[in-house]
Swiss-Prot record:
Biological process, per Gene Ontology: diaminopimelate biosynthetic process; lysine biosynthetic process via diaminopimelate
Cell location: Cytoplasm
Protein family: Belongs to the DapB family.
Protein name: 4-hydroxy-tetrahydrodipicolinate reductase
The organism's taxonomic lineage, starting at the top: Archaea, Methanobacteriati, Methanobacteriota, Stenosarchaea group, Methanomicrobia
Naturally occurring in which organism (per UniProt): Methanosarcina barkeri (strain Fusaro / DSM 804)
Any one of the GO CC terms: cytoplasm
Binding residues annotated for (S)-2,3,4,5-tetrahydrodipicolinate, in chain numbering: 158, 167-168
This protein's pathway: Amino-acid biosynthesis; L-lysine biosynthesis via DAP pathway; (S)-tetrahydrodipicolinate from L-aspartate: step 4/4
One Pfam family it belongs to: DapB_C
Primary localization: cytoplasm
Active-site residues, as the UniProt record annotates them: 157, 161
């Protein structure tokens, strides 16, 4: 049985992750953290009834992780929180699933160093949906044959998402850029200027959109659109739980969803 701890357990993603953890026959929830609602049952927020696991103050992360004997910590919070909490967990010997987006290169370096020092296993991905990771594979292949086409990425999310562009859009841009030998990124368009070899990246924040991503390859007289639409956050929670089961069987190191899915 895998002992799982969840950060941000009272939030939209965290509560879905709790729900999926308790529905797994190979996992049990042993700790749940947030910045408020201390002492309340984690099952209350996941709407699954009482679980006997109270919400703990994230300030007590290291102590609770050790006392609960957590094997893996799942973190879908915010960049400023993850850069503090992930190193604490790694140095406590707890494996990590990180779905936080908006990490700067400097923050990512801090996290990577802590994982290496702690000799734990971690999956770090901007998107845990199986479909999105297949989408990544498809656009990589398409870009190899369409390097002379104009390439644009359009993403849309709900109006509460703080970071823009999305981590998924940035990962898509990196995949395409690597496939075509490098391109400059342009975020939105404004003014009058010549265009070079670039990838345009455009973000929309509106309503309750779960997550839409479109990659547009446009040539003369034709265009190809490759699209992924998320209808529910459940796909991210299910993918994170799948990754947590997988990572606990791996040697220490930093992995991606490509590794989890064998893509």
């Amino acid at each position: 049985m895998i002992n799982v701890a969840v950060l941000g357990a009272c939030g939209r993603m965290g509560s879905l992750i709790v729900e999926n953890v308790i529905n797994s026959k190979d996992m049990q929830l042993v700790a749940a953290f947030d910045i408020s609602y201390f002492g309340r049952d984690a099952g209350e927020f996941a709407r699954v009834g009482k679980l006997g696991v109270q919400i703990s103050d994230v300030k007590n992360l290291e102590t609770v992780l050790k006392e609960s004997k957590a094997d893996v910590l799942i973190d879908f919070t915010a960049a400023g929180a993850t850069v503090v909490n992930a190193p604490i967990a790694a140095r406590a010997g707890v494996n990590l699933i990180i779905g936080t987006t908006g990490l700067t290169p400097e923050q990512r370096a801090v996290i990577d160093e802590a994982i290496q020092e702690g000799q734990v296993s971690a999956v770090i991905s901007p998107n845990y949906s199986v479909g999105v990771n297949v989408f990544f594979k498809i656009i990589r292949e398409a870009a190899k044959y369409l390097a002379d086409y104009d390439i644009e990425i359009i993403e849309a999310h709900h109006n509460q998402k703080k970071d823009a562009p999305s981590g998924t859009a940035l990962r898509a841009a990196d995949i395409i850029s690597e496939a075509v030998g490098g391109r400059e990124y342009v975020y939105g368009r404004e003014g009058i200027a010549p265009r070079g070899k670039e990838i345009g990246i455009h973000g929309v924040r509106a309503g309750d959109i779960t997550g839409d991503h479109i990659v547009l390859f446009a040539g003369n007289s034709e265009r190809i659109e490759i699209k992924h639409i998320a209808h529910s956050r459940q796909i991210f929670a299910k993918g994170a739980v799948r990754a947590a089961e997988w990572v606990c069987r791996q040697k220490p190191g930093i992995y991606s969803m490509d590794d989890v899915l064998g893509l």
